[in-house]
Amino acid sequence: MYSIQELQTYINRCLPIFGLTQWKVEVSKHPTEEDNWADIEVSDNLWSATLRVSSDFWGLDNDEKRRIVAHELLHVHYSGPERTVESLNGVLGTEAYSLLSTVFEKEIERAADALSTVVARLLPPVDVHSS
């Protein structure tokens, strides 16, 4: 089976474990930037997100793929606070907003990294291959 389709099936299996049953997370055919294994963009529309993976993602071992999936799905839960911070752009002064957004982004990534290692163990084994 084509790897994007396998990953989509896997993501769909993981959504209930994350309490994201109302969400549609679509795996994009377009890769993310090469310096990221994956990224997720939560739409302004309710309950919709797009996951992109880099070409390097497919060469990772399956446990690392599972951890990365967990990391990205955690970001779906963080999208509300992230939008709150983004809404302050133009309200706060440039320096204050820059400081807030930089610190917030760094701390969200730290939280996702720490939690993804633990949460990944709750996910089913991943068996997603390169196309």
Question: What role is predicted for each listed range?
Answer:
Residues R67-G80:
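Active-site recognition of the HExxH zinc-binding catalytic motif
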Residues M1-D63, G80-S131:
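Metalloprotease/metallohydrolase-associated module, dominated by Zn2+-dependent proteases
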